[in-house]
Curated annotation (Swiss-Prot):
Oligomer and partners: Homodimer. Heterotetramer of two MnmE and two MnmG subunits.
Keywords: Cytoplasm, FAD, Flavoprotein, NAD, tRNA processing
Entry's Gene Ontology molecular function annotations: flavin adenine dinucleotide binding
Lineage top rank: taxon: Bacteria
Pfam families: GIDA (PF01134), GIDA_C_1st (PF21680), SAM_GIDA_C (PF13932)
Name under which the protein is recorded: tRNA uridine 5-carboxymethylaminomethyl modification enzyme MnmG
Annotated NAD(+) binding sites: 275-289
This protein's GO CC annotations: cytosol
Family listed: Belongs to the MnmG family.
């Protein structure tokens, strides 16, 4: 029973304070909703349970999208990063991706500090053991210490803590992270509501002592000389950067692992759930990729003030003594000392096809799920979902229409669409290959694509929004100039042509056509086009990309318009899919299960291909 002075009525309650929960609570409270964040330990708010890094391929795109929408992750990593790197710069701009190593503890403390500053946010250390539901509407939560808090909107962000078990060899313990308790009450609650539960597995590598590593002869991986921020509000990164190191497994390592596979919970049958396909354990790598004579390991620092080092690439649940043995067979780690062992963890998740695209459950109104409870893996995927859930809670409280992010405008849209329509068979990780329109969904233009949503919701400052509009107005102005202005002879141009060994150049072509040449970069135009001086380096990079890839961008936009024209065609909720001649049996079963609202949603259901959607389109048009 709550004391009379204890506030117990909230607009939104967020359960769990990992990367989904902190983003959800931040967005909700920032928008003015009276919000309660409940976490089992205040000291682990925003904790990096696995790798001490933010961003990466496609993940960095999502961090920038979260930032453009008013979120927290990008700003905090800019303030706490210890190495910044733009990945994939040797490839096309659609797959360039920012990544940063974090000062792990400082990142966590900064997240907590940002939450504590919000006037509309209350933070409580407790667990949630049950939900109060009247009819099919959530009305509150009951905590482990017996308190009741009331709300019509609950966001569950329980991470890996639902009925979780950790495994190290034959050792098993009910735990959400090593040394932390599990929670079972909510698993029973969700089952009671007939939400489909499943089991997934993830893992983490050992943490080792820096002073026990011999760095001589290891490959050094430095950060970028001129690091680019994640947040559009960060003007410059001026933090001291420290290197990572690279080493490799070898035949001896692999043999030691093979000799001890019977003690691996994954191979002994002790673990029956499915692990992440794209982040396999070292045991899996050795077995599945037996033809490889080595596997790469990144030795990553966890901060300036700690000697803990993270061994990226050797996630394992082998017995602790085996971990010592195989790690000491690796170059640079011959005398390594483990500070924390690697381990695997099994946990409950809820089938995400139980959710609407708002991340609200279909069976319980006002109940939203975000993060690993939806079968995803990764801090960035979690943060994106926390933001989506919070955006839609805000819309609900304000009695406004929900916000549905489209695949054509964001990786966040791709993520949610994949989850709620295709579901997951193993922990879901975002890749650029999952996005059909990835040339439009670049990391550099996330603000142009999404910031208006955040501004209209009151989550992005007017000054930041105005800066964005001014930025793209400048870029568009120069781009128009390049397309309408012809190349003319000049001493500056002659010098560029000589340096590039370009002969017999025909004048009269546009400046844009000159820039489209593979041997010409935007910097080559600077002596010729004085107007470029009004752009900063990032703006010039955007301009160059939009000119060079103009044809591809135009084609993607045309494809989007075509789909808008036809794929938004509504499907009646009681539509008889079996009546469509030629539709595959698998497609009929999947369509009847998911009941998509329109043809675009139908296209994104696993087991339904474009030819099935074409048949549906013809049938629906004939009916009308």
């Amino acid at each position: 029973m709550n004391p009379s002075f204890y506030p117990n009525q909230f607009d939104c309650i967020v359960v769990g304070a990992g990367h989904a929960g902190t983003e959800a609570a931040y967005i909700s409270a920032k928008a003015g909703l009276k919000t309660l964040l409940i976490t089992m330990n205040l000291d682990t708010i925003g904790q990096m349970s696995c790798n001490p890094a933010i961003g990466g391929i496609a993940k960095g795109h999502m961090v920038r999208e979260v930032d453009a929408l008013g979120g927290l992750m990008g700003r905090v990593i800019d303030q706490t990063g210890i190495q910044f790197k733009m990945l994939n710069t040797s490839k096309g701009p659609s797959v360039w991706a920012p990544r940063a190593q974090a000062e792990k503890k400082q990142y966590q403390l900064m997240i907590k500090h940002q939450l504590e500053k919000l006037q509309q946010l209350s933070i409580r250390q407790d667990t949630v053991e049950d939900l109060i539901v009247e009819g099919n509407q959530v009305t509150g939560v009951i905590t482990g210490r017996g308190f009741t808090f009331y709300t019509n909107h609950v966001i569950l962000t329980t991470g890996t803590f639902l009925s979780s078990v950790i495994h190290i060899g034959t050792y098993q313990k009910e735990s959400g992270r090593i040394g932390e308790p599990t929670t079972k009450g909510l698993s029973h609650t969700l089952a009671r509501f007939e939400l489909r539960l499943g089991r997934l597995k993830t893992g983490t590598p050992a943490r080792v002592h820096k002073n026990s590593i011999n760095f001589d002869g290891l490959e050094i991986q430095d950060g970028d000389e001129n690091p680019r921020p994640f947040s559009f509000s960060t003007k410059k990164i001026d933090r001291k950067q420290i290197p990572c190191f690279i080493t490799y497994t070898n035949d001896t390592t692999h043999e030691l692992i093979k000799q001890n596979l019977e003690y691996s919970p994954m191979y002994s049958g002790q673990i029956k759930s499915v692990g992440p396909r794209y982040c396999p354990s070292i045991e899996d790598k050795v077995v599945r990729f037996a033809e490889r004579d080595r596997h790469q390991i990144f030795i990553e620092p966890e901060g300036y003030e700690t000697n803990e080092m993270y061994l990226n690439g050797v996630s394992t649940s082998l017995p602790e003594e085996v971990q010592w043995k195989f790690l000491r067979s690796i170059k640079g780690l011959e005398q390594v000392e483990l500070m924390r062992p690697g381990y695997a963890i099994e946990y409950d998740y809820v089938d995400p096809t139980e959710l609407h695209p708002t991340l609200e459950t279909k069976k319980v109104k006002g109940l939203y799920h975000a993060g690993q409870i939806n079968g995803t893996t990764g801090y960035e995927e979690a943060a994106a979902q926390g933001l989506v859930a919070a955006y839609n809670v805000i819309r609900s409280v304000r009695k406004e229409e929900p916000i549905l992010f489209k695949r054509s405008e964001s990786y966040i849209g791709v993520l949610v669409d994949d989850l709620v329509y295709k579901g997951v068979e193993d922990p879901y990780r975002m890749f650029t290959s999952r996005a059909e329109y990835r040339l439009l969904l670049r990391q550099d233009n996330a603000d142009q694509r999404l910031m208006q949503y955040g501004y209209e919701m009151g989550l992005v400052e007017e000054s930041l929004y105005k800066d964005m509009k001014d930025r793209y107005a400048r870029i568009e102005s120069i781009k128009s100039h390049l397309f309408v202005s012809a190349m003319k002879p000049s001493p500056e141009l002659t010098k560029v042509l000589e340096e590039k060994q370009i002969t017999n150049y025909k004048f009269g072509h546009s400046l844009s056509s000159f820039l489209k040449r593979s041997d010409i970069k935007i910097k080559d135009l600077e002596p010729i086009v004085s107007e470029l001086s009004i752009l900063n380096e990032d703006e010039k990079a955007v301009l160059e990309m939009e000119v060079k890839y103009e044809g591809y961008l135009k084609r993607e936009l045309e494809t989007i318009e075509y789909r808008k024209k036809f794929l938004n065609f509504q499907i009646p909720i009681d539509f008889d899919y079996a009546s469509v001649k030629g539709l595959k049996t698998e497609a009929i079963v999947k369509l009847e299960k998911h009941r998509p609202l329109n043809l675009e949603n139908a296209l994104h259901i696993s087991g339904v291909d474009p030819s099935d959607v074409d048949l549906l389109l013809y049938h629906l048009v004939d009916r009308h």
